[in-house]
Amino acid sequence: MAKEATRVRRRERKNISSGVAHVNSTFNNTMITITDAQGNAIAWSSAGAQGFKGSRKSTPFAAQIAAEDCAKKAQEHGMRSLEVEVCGPGSGRESALRALQAAGFVITSIRDVTPIPHNGCRPRKKRRV
């Protein structure tokens, strides 16, 4: 029996000039998602997706590499300017932001959207190293 030829679906190139970069920086990883104004994801990347494993995912260098990769994917869609929303306490916040700027994006605004409780849930216990 002959196998049917599978069609390869190509991602259609959207021509979007401006968008929002969501930088989620945790203690263990840094994830960058670039969306359009409505919130539809255009490109994403993370330190783990770039091949960093374990504690190396949480470094600023890993965040920089992930941001460069995400920027390259977004520029293929014609994106030129970004608003940046930074979330989380991790070490990759500033380096990801610098990498997006160095990639050639015009950054129009930077917002910190880290959720801060008004004395909500009890936090986890402090680490004793």
From Swiss-Prot:
Keyword Oxidoreductase attached: no
The entry's keywords: Ribonucleoprotein, Ribosomal protein, RNA-binding, rRNA-binding
SUPFAM superfamilies membership: Translational machinery components (SSF53137)
GO biological process, alphabetically ordered: translation
Annotated Gene Ontology cellular component terms: ribonucleoprotein complex; ribosome
PROSITE patterns, sorted: RIBOSOMAL_S11
InterPro entries membership: Ribosomal_uS11 (IPR001971), Ribosomal_uS11_bac-type (IPR019981), Ribosomal_uS11_CS (IPR018102), Ribosomal_uS11_sf (IPR036967)
Family assignment from sequence similarity: Belongs to the universal ribosomal protein uS11 family.
NCBIfam families: PRK05309.1, uS11_bact
Name of this protein: Small ribosomal subunit protein uS11
Gene source species: Brucella anthropi (strain ATCC 49188 / DSM 6882 / CCUG 24695 / JCM 21032 / LMG 3331 / NBRC 15819 / NCTC 12168 / Alc 37)
